[in-house]
């Protein structure tokens, strides 16, 4: 199952700036928190799905000017309706109440650890990772500061983004 919440995407000329890095950071935070919530549901008795995730896709299908906050799940056999209900309920809970400061802090730490790992492994980076970064830059207006600069900037950004800004972003996406 897929649920798409279509939205305008950040214009390419802004996506190439620090605004693009901030947007990507907040997207990663939102996806991380939603994925953690879905994982909690998976650990309850009789979850309706086998797998669920949420993410923001800057290219909704083939539309270059639209993005989509996407909530997806692999339903258990005979559980499509309850899976859909669970996804919608969880999304509506986020829309109504947002994320908690403790959820944000856990996600912030996890995202920063991922960047730290990429930074520490920068000398072992495979060529295809560079290719993807450059293709994204030219096709979607992404930024290419390199992991050293990205890691430094992200550590500064993460300290200055409050949970309220993250909540405003996700509410704008699923509005």
Label for each model-derived stretch:
Residues 28, 87, 166:
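Divalent metal-coordination and catalytic microenvironments
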Residues 169-173:
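Amphipathic heptad-repeat coiled-coil/leucine-zipper-like oligomerization helices
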